[in-house]
Amino acid sequence: SEMCIRDRFGRKHVFNTEQEDHSWIPTEGKITFPSTKKHGWHDYVDSRRLEITCGEAPFLVSRYDAATGAILPISQRIGLLDRKLRIVDEHTEDDLMWWKWTLRAFQSVYGYEFQGDSLLIARANLLLTFVDHYHNRFGTDPDKNHLKQIANVIVWNLWQMDGLTETIPFRKPPEQKVEFDMLDMLTMLDEPNSQDVPAFVRLYDWRAKTSLSYSQLLKGAKQ
């Protein structure tokens, strides 16, 4: 939001200026950052962002006009990941550094969605966003190795989940047992129904290089 941008940068209209008709005009020139500690461009790119019930992930990437479906020029895109990629493009001259921080930008954004078809579109939107930015930078399409690395991040960071239970949809959430009796012991010997086994979501912390649960990710983000 504009308030978050103002808190981080100490000024308004860093990326774009909204018009009365709710359209926007992107700012021109290289975006500068405050000199205060942990407010540099590296910190901005690494800052984690989560879009809940993300649908097609319009807050992460804005590849197209939601009303018309027309593809937007890169300069007109204002999604959270779009902004990070703009910063990377403006602040890196070396191609290897561009790739390093582009990858980190993708590693920093997360989203979950209940509906599988919407999730598929969201993942495609992020992957195509990478293709767009790569082509804009180098004038050619990315090779298979770069695509595989970005795709691996996307399938980890955008996942299917029921936000109420924090489990895979249609899986039964675990019940809180107060007592444990003989009947419980007998039922434990039965083959469980796969639909009754809770499946908690596992994510990946790319900086710590470890897998963790969704609740652990939220706890770490609040610290």
Model-found features: residue ranges?
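Conserved proline-anchored active-site loop of SAM-dependent methyltransferases
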Residues: 44-65, 109-119, 158-167, 173-209, ...
